[in-house]
């Protein structure tokens, strides 16, 4: 078995929604990114790649490559799952923590879990997503952006 950790951050920019866990969430800002800015799926992708010893999403989907401009992070995550499986691994479980002062995440977490489980080809109880604030401290507390920590357990296929 292997464990991987992923971390990602995106800065807020002009916009009226963010995408997290494949869910479009109305917000007073958007997220600045080369792809769709889904910081949750980016952190999960990094955790999976790290556990399999396959580098990170920047290696597989460089932000200098125009083919990934505006890319759907669910498509990228499914690709990551495919290369992890090709190396002889399957997902045991994943756990992620969204760090954001706003928007409120609780109304969206179950849908995020469902979409992630679908993309990872696992049962819903193998996916956990939670959210916390930093009590208005730091860049997330000042509502400058969102961060996500994620861990993944891989098992031999």
From Swiss-Prot:
Binding site for a divalent metal cation: 8, 10, 42
Record EC number: 4.6.1.12
The protein's required cofactors: a divalent metal cation
Pfam families found in the cross-reference section: YgbB (PF02542)
Keywords: Isoprene biosynthesis, Lyase, Metal-binding
Catalytic activity of the protein: 4-CDP-2-C-methyl-D-erythritol 2-phosphate = 2-C-methyl-D-erythritol 2,4-cyclic diphosphate + CMP
Site description Transition state stabilizer, residues in chain: 34, 133
Free-text cofactor note: Binds 1 divalent metal cation per subunit.
GO biological process entries: isopentenyl diphosphate biosynthetic process, methylerythritol 4-phosphate pathway; terpenoid biosynthetic process
Residue positions binding 4-CDP-2-C-methyl-D-erythritol 2-phosphate: 8-10, 34-35, 56-58, 61-65, 132-135, 139, 142
Protein family (similarity comment): Belongs to the IspF family.
HAMAP family in UniProt: IspF
Subunit structure of this chain's protein: Homotrimer.
Record-given protein name: 2-C-methyl-D-erythritol 2,4-cyclodiphosphate synthase
Organism of derivation: Pseudomonas putida (strain W619)
Gene name of this polypeptide: ispF
């Amino acid at each position: 078995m292997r464990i991987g950790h992923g971390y990602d951050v995106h800065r807020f920019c002009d916009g009226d929604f963010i995408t997290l866990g494949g869910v479009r969430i109305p917000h007073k800002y958007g997220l600045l990114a080369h792809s769709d800015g889904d910081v949750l799926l980016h952190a999960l992708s990094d955790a999976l790649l790290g556990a399999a010893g396959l580098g990170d999403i920047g290696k597989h989907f460089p932000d200098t490559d125009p083919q990934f401009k505006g890319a759907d992070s669910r498509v990228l995550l499914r690709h990551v799952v495919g290369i992890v499986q090709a190396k002889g691994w399957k997902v045991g479980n994943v756990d992620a923590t969204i760090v954001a002062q706003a928007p409120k995440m609780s109304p969206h977490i179950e849908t995020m879990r469902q979409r992630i489980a679908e993309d990872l080809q696992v049962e819903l109880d193998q996916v956990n997503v939670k959210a916390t604030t930093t009590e208005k401290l730091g860049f997330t507390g000042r509502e400058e952006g969102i961060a996500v920590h994620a861990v993944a357990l891989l098992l031999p296929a």
